[in-house]
UniProtKB/Swiss-Prot annotation:
The keyword Repressor does not apply. Keywords: Hydrolase. Signal peptide: none annotated. NCBIfam families: Gln_ase. One of its GO terms (biological process) is glutamate biosynthetic process. GO terms for molecular function: glutaminase activity. This is Glutaminase 1. It catalyses: L-glutamine + H2O = L-glutamate + NH4(+). Belongs to the glutaminase family. InterPro entries: Beta-lactam/transpept-like, Glutaminase. It comes from Bacillus cereus (strain ATCC 14579 / DSM 31 / CCUG 7414 / JCM 2152 / NBRC 15305 / NCIMB 9373 / NCTC 2599 / NRRL B-3711).
Length: 309
């Protein structure tokens, strides 16, 4: 890490910038279609020397599927492993993240993992709280603590945009309710889920989340354990096997670190015991990952020897 400098990051951004022209915005969520496809930013948060950043690293964007890691950690804290994995599986899937196929063809009929939409919805339904306001406040408090940013909130504009068009997610919920995976009110769950996905961060926030997971839940700046080590281990394992949608296998080969992406263009990754990386690039490849973000992580991993394999 010590050899990575801001100038080096800037050069890498310029090197991969042309890839943004090959990607597309996630226009199926109307608000995400308003992003600038040329935006590209990165931050790296180290355990000792704080962070370096380059490009559009302070532009706000929504977590989207990155929030699945946050809520998984919270659900495991609330309910424990036995309950969580009685409702959601641990296996990767070759299907799209919003597919219903495996719910229909797998026995018992439960989502294969917490990183696909069906699994993430089931996880969100497990969060403790008397109502959605309390549950959302717990999610925000958790994100604020691991980012050390008390100003973090969610975009009601993005949440409303998602809620209006989330027909497929609703169908996943109704199917799971029919099969006893969830038992809550569907519209209440959809409201909470779209809000969790609409939590706004920048690359620096995302890199700090990556650092906490890289340090097995320990915050080296606050000098305290924020997330139990065994929970971060579970989360990082899912990040390796399922974190990059249907490119998780290729990402493991080309980059080789635990990472999670979201369709707003964010990616966060962690290098064990050392650093967290946060990237923003809203131009996506065919699998829903930041096309330039993937490339810059590939180059950095090759340069720095990050791969865990």
């Amino acid at each position: 890490m010590q050899c990575i400098e801001t100038n080096n990051l800037q050069q890498l951004l310029e090197q991969v910038k042309p890839y943004t022209k090959k990607g597309k915005l996630a226009t199926y969520i109307p608000e995400l279609g308003n992003a600038n496809p040329d935006d590209l930013g990165i931050a790296i948060f180290h355990k000792e020397t704080e962070y370096i950043h380059a490009g559009n690293s302070q532009t706000l964007f929504t977590l989207q599927s990155i929030s699945k890691v946050i809520t998984l950690a919270l659900a495991l804290l609330d309910r424990g492993e036995e309950y969580v994995f009685s409702k959601v599986g641990m296996e990767p899937t070759g299907d799209p993240f919003n597919s219903i196929i495996k719910l229909e063809t797998t026995s018992p009929s439960k989502p294969l993992n917490p990183m696909i939409n069906a699994g993430a919805l089931a996880i969100t339904s497990m969060l403790e709280g008397k109502d959605n306001e309390e549950k959302m406040e717990r999610i925000l408090h958790f994100v604020r603590e691991i980012t050390d940013n008390p100003t973090i909130n969610y975009s009601s504009k993005v949440a409303d945009s998602e809620l209006e068009t989330a027909y497929l997610n609703r169908s996943l919920c109704y199917y799971m309710k029919q099969n006893g995976i969830i038992d809550c009110d569907i519209e209440e769950l959809m409201d909470l889920y779209t809000r969790q996905c609409a939590v706004e961060v920048n690359c620096i926030d995302l890199a700090r989340i990556g650092l906490i997971f890289a340090m097995d839940g320990y915050d080296p700046y606050k000098k305290k354990q924020i997330i139990p080590k065994h929970i971060t281990k579970i989360c990082k394992t899912f990040m390796v096997t399922c974190g990059m949608y249907n490119e998780s296998g290729e990402f493991a080969i080309r980059v080789g670190i635990p990472a999670k992406s979201g369709v707003a263009g964010g990616i966060f990754g962690c290098v064990k015991g050392d650093m967290g990386i946060g990237i923003f690039g809203p131009a996506l490849d065919a699998n829903g990952n930041s096309i330039a973000g993937f490339k810059i992580l590939e180059l950095l991993s090759a340069q720095e020897g990050w791969s865990i394999f």
